[in-house]
Amino acid sequence: MANLGYIQVVRHCNHFCGFCSNPTTPYTHDFESMRVLVDDLVARGYFGVIMTGGEPTLHPELPRIVAYAAERGLHVRMITNGWRLGDRAFAAELAAAGLRLVHVSIYSVRPEVEARLRGAEGTLGRAFAALDAAHAAGIEVNVNCVINRLNADHLDESVRYLIAHHPFVRHFVWNNLDPSMGRAEVNQESFVPRLADFELSLHRALRLLERSGRSFRVEKVPLCYMTEFAWASTETRKIVKLEERVVHFLDDKQTVRQTEWEHLYAPGCAACSLRPICGGLFDRGEAYDPAELAPVFVDMEGVVRRILEDPSDPSRRWSSLAAWRRDFAAARAGGDVGASGGVAGDDGSSEFRRDVLRDMQIGAVSVPVGRVTARGRRLYEARRRSEGEKAEALGVQMERGAAASGDGEATGEG
């Protein structure tokens, strides 16, 4: 199976997104603490590692840990805002170290929207420069986009622009905003879209990508809002292929292993033909409305077949659809898949408490992730003061708590 692990290299950032899922913490890494995490993923037999953050390019030893992960045989990827990657010498250094693929986050090709979402001016031009620099260095380039209230109506516009001006970008990842963690949790009115807000724009974007011969994945969008492209759902692909992921969080959560991908459903979802392979509503019904969900009636095995026969996917292969059915049924019976989906009541509430559902979805693993030092604490406090000033200037709220931040992120999985 093509399991991918995540290492949060840092948790600070040079941007200030009002919906950030993994904001600043006092934890820090050095090379040795990251090396242990790379070894952990190798020991698990994982295919690759995604270096993420915060903004991973801010760590001074990023090229060294990339080189180590590549030497250990991992396919090394990185998620970045692109601010530093636009430096062609830096991009070349990362390529030489073994970085194979980079996900550059671009939320909108409208400069004013991108600046508002990033909390900084000039970010769009730097992201475009990062695309070009990475491509020139021989790094495969993907684009990540978090779907939110400010870009929900023009996702297809961004695709059209990027195809025209950066034609070497061949893969896109769409992440529907998770409003249950980080700053998004306290700024829902500003950033969380309704599912219907982006349905048409997303469909147009995916159609454009498909017709241009590009690939794409979509995260945290229920299949009733992307039925034609159900095979491209990240959660659906993980459910079908019985995959897991490990995230080495640089906060109080530390290392977690996720093996289940189903979340919240409306009562009507029980009749849906795609229910067994749908991730449902990611936020457990606290911001999105389960009333927006509706059953669809299409051939589920047609979706499964397209996922299993994908020639670009390095996952395990089943010898036949019948063999997959047996494994899938056994996994569901054993609780590895599908045991944790909550059902929304008539009032939209979940039958599961948030903490219970999280415990069912995420299993802790005892691998130490970073540490809190006196210097790290001082830097954290200084960053929090600076971020507080930015939040006030932008009219957004700071996240709840201090060190812990939530249980997921925009992953960029392919």
Where are these regions (language model features)?
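Canonical Radical SAM [4Fe-4S] cluster-binding loop centered on the CxxxCxxC motif
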Residues: 1-33
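Residues that line or immediately flank small-molecule/substrate-binding pockets and catalytic motifs
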Residues: 24, 53, 106, 176, ...
